[in-house]
Amino acid sequence: MRCPFCNSVDTSVKNSRPSDCKMSVRRRRSCDSCNSRFTTVEELLLKPVKVLKKDGSVEAFDRQKLLTSIILATKKRPVTRDQIDMVVSNMFYKLEAIKGSVVPSGVIGGMVMESLFALDKVSYIRFASVYMNFSDVNDFSGIVERVQEVV
C-alpha cells in the first residue's frame, strides 16, 4: 500500500479488525519511510448491482443516491450517520447477494422502508411520502395509522 503522505511503498499493517457488518476490514498502517499513520478499508468486491427502473430501463446501482435519500428522510431526527451508513452497507451487501444482480427499484424501496421502520418511525413516514408519491393528507393519515397499530 502506497503512503498517502510521501508515496513510499514501504508500509506495514499495525492493526486489523473487521467492520461492524463483517463485510470489510479496517487496517491501521504505518509508513516505514516517513512514520506517518493512516487507515485503509478493505472490502470484498462482488458483481455490480443493476437496478431495473419502473420505466424498464436498467442502470447501475448508485450507493450515493441511496445514502442521500436516507439522509434526507432522517434529517433533524435522532439517527446518527453511523446508523445510516450501517443501513446502506447492509442493504448493499444484501443486493449484491441477489442472483443476477438486476434488482427492481421497488425491492430497493421496500428494503429502505423496512430499515427505516425499524430505525425511526418519523423517518419511515417521510421516506414513504416520497417513495409512495403521497398526493393528499389522507395518504399520510393512512400510513400514520399503520405505524400506530404496530407501536
From Swiss-Prot:
The keyword Secreted does not apply. Keywords: ATP-binding, DNA-binding, Metal-binding, Nucleotide-binding, Repressor, Transcription, Transcription regulation, Zinc, Zinc-finger. The keyword Transcription applies. It comes from the Bacteria. Residues 49-139 form the ATP-cone domain. GO terms for molecular function: ATP binding; DNA binding; zinc ion binding. InterPro entries: ATP-cone_dom, NrdR-like_N, RNR_NrdR-like. Binds 1 zinc ion. A zinc finger (unnamed) spans 3-34. One of its GO terms (biological process) is negative regulation of DNA-templated transcription. Its cofactor is Zn(2+). Negatively regulates transcription of bacterial ribonucleotide reductase nrd genes and operons by binding to NrdR-boxes. PANTHER family: TRANSCRIPTIONAL REPRESSOR NRDR (PTHR30455:SF2). Belongs to the NrdR family. This is Transcriptional repressor NrdR. It comes from Anaplasma marginale (strain Florida). The lineage of its organism: Bacteria, Pseudomonadati, Pseudomonadota, Alphaproteobacteria, Rickettsiales.
